[in-house]
C-alpha cells in the first residue's frame, strides 16, 4: 500500500469562480458580510451550486448559519450531473483543493460508509468533472477558516435514487445528522426553466413567467420546510420541477424523519430565493437558487 496523498484539483476554479485565493476570499467575505446569522448553529443547509456570479450572494445566506466552533465534520451531498449513478458514490482521493486552502476527507467516516456496501467509488475523472460538490468547497473553507485544521469533509455524490433508496440512505445518514458536531451541506439549484432545459411549466394565473416559476419553487420550498419526504416526492411527480438536487434533498428529509421518530425536534427555514434572470418570454431561460438552514431545538 502506498501512502501517496491523492488530491482532487479545484477543476472549476478560473471558470465558475475565481482561481485567485485573495480575490475569492474578498468576494466570499463581501457576500457573507451582507447577511444575518439568525439560524446558528445550522445542523444542515441547502445551498446552490452555480457559478458564483449567479448564486454567490444567495449561498451566503446558508453559510452564514454555520458555526465553526461546533462543526468538526462536514458531509457534502451533491447530485451527479455527468455519470449515471443509481446509488451514492464516495471520492477516491484524500484531499480536495480550493484556492483558499486544502480540505481533508474524513477517511474514518468513509470507512464506516464503505463497510455498509451501499456505496461505490467515483473515479478522479468523475470527481473533477462534477461541480455540485466543488462549488461548496470555497464557501466551506471560508465558513470554517477560524478552525481550519480542526475539521474534515465527507463528500458524497448522490445518484438518481428511488424513493426506497432515499429512505435507506436517509436512515444511514440519520445517525450522523444526530451529532451536533456534524454539518450536512445539501447541494441543489431549483427550477431550470426554458427550452434549453426542456422545461416550460407556466401557470398564467401567476402573471409573468418568472412569477410562475417563483410560485412553483416556493411551493416546493414550503414542502421542504414541512420536512415531509413523501409530499416532496409527490410534488416532484406532479409538477416535474427541475430541482437538480432533488435526491440529496430527499435523503436529508428522510434522515430528518428518522430522527423525528426518535423525538428530535428540528425546523428548516429558507432564508433567500433568487433567479439568474427574469423570464418573460418563451425564448428566455433561468435557473433558480434557494438557501436555507436546519436547526435542532
Swiss-Prot record:
Protein's UniProt keywords contain Phosphoprotein: yes
PANTHER family: PROTEIN MEMO1
Recorded superkingdom: Eukaryota
GO biological process assignments: regulation of microtubule-based process
Positions carrying Phosphotyrosine: 210
Subunit structure: Interacts with ERBB2 phosphorylated on 'Tyr-1249'.
InterPro entries hit by this protein: MEMO1_fam (IPR002737)
Gene3D superfamilies from the UniProt entry: LigB-like
HAMAP family the UniProt entry points to: MEMO1
Biological role stated in the UniProt entry: May control cell migration by relaying extracellular chemotactic signals to the microtubule cytoskeleton. Mediator of ERBB2 signaling. The MEMO1-RHOA-DIAPH1 signaling pathway plays an important role in ERBB2-dependent stabilization of microtubules at the cell cortex. It controls the localization of APC and CLASP2 to the cell membrane, via the regulation of GSK3B activity. In turn, membrane-bound APC allows the localization of the MACF1 to the cell membrane, which is required for microtubule capture and stabilization.
Keywords: Phosphoprotein
Identification of the protein by name: Protein MEMO1
Family: Belongs to the MEMO1 family.
GO molecular function: peptide binding
Amino acid at each position: 500500500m502506498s501512502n501517496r496523498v491523492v488530491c482532487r484539483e479545484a477543476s472549476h476554479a478560473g471558470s465558475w469562480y475565481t482561481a485567485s485565493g485573495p480575490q475569492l476570499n474578498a468576494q466570499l467575505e463581501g457576500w457573507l458580510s451582507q447577511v444575518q446569522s439568525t439560524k446558528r448553529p445550522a445542523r444542515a443547509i441547502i445551498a446552490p451550486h452555480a457559478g458564483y456570479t449567479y448564486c454567490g450572494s444567495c449561498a451566503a445566506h446558508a453559510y452564514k448559519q454555520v458555526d465553526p466552533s461546533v462543526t468538526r465534520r462536514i458531509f457534502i451531498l451533491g447530485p451527479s450531473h455527468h455519470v449515471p449513478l443509481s446509488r451514492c458514490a464516495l471520492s477516491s482521493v484524500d484531499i480536495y483543493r480550493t484556492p483558499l486552502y486544502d480540505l481533508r476527507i474524513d477517511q474514518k467516516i468513509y470507512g464506516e460508509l464503505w463497510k455498509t456496501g451501499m456505496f461505490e467509488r467515483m473515479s478522479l475523472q468523475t470527481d473533477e468533472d462534477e461541480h455540485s460538490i466543488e462549488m461548496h468547497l470555497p464557501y466551506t473553507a471560508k465558513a470554517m477558516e477560524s478552525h481550519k485544521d480542526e475539521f474534515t469533509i465527507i463528500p458524497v455524490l448522490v445518484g438518481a435514487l428511488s424513493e426506497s433508496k432515499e429512505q435507506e440512505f436517509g436512515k444511514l445518514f440519520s445517525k450522523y445528522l444526530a451529532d451536533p458536531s456534524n454539518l450536512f451541506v445539501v447541494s441543489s439549484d431549483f427550477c431550470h426553466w426554458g427550452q434549453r432545459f426542456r422545461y416550460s411549466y407556466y401557470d398564467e394565473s401567476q402573471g409573468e413567467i418568472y412569477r410562475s416559476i417563483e410560485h412553483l419553487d416556493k411551493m416546493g420550498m414550503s414542502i421542504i420546510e414541512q420536512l415531509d419526504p413523501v409530499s416532496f416526492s409527490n410534488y416532484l411527480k406532479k409538477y416535474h420541477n427541475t430541482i437538480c438536487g432533488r435526491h440529496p434533498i430527499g435523503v436529508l428529509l428522510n434522515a430528518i424523519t428518522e430522527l423525528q421518530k426518535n423525538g428530535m425536534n428540528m425546523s428548516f427555514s429558507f432564508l433567500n430565493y433568487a433567479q439568474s434572470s427574469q423570464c418573460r418570454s418563451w425564448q428566455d431561460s433561468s435557473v433558480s437558487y434557494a438557501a436555507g438552514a436546519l436547526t435542532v431545538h
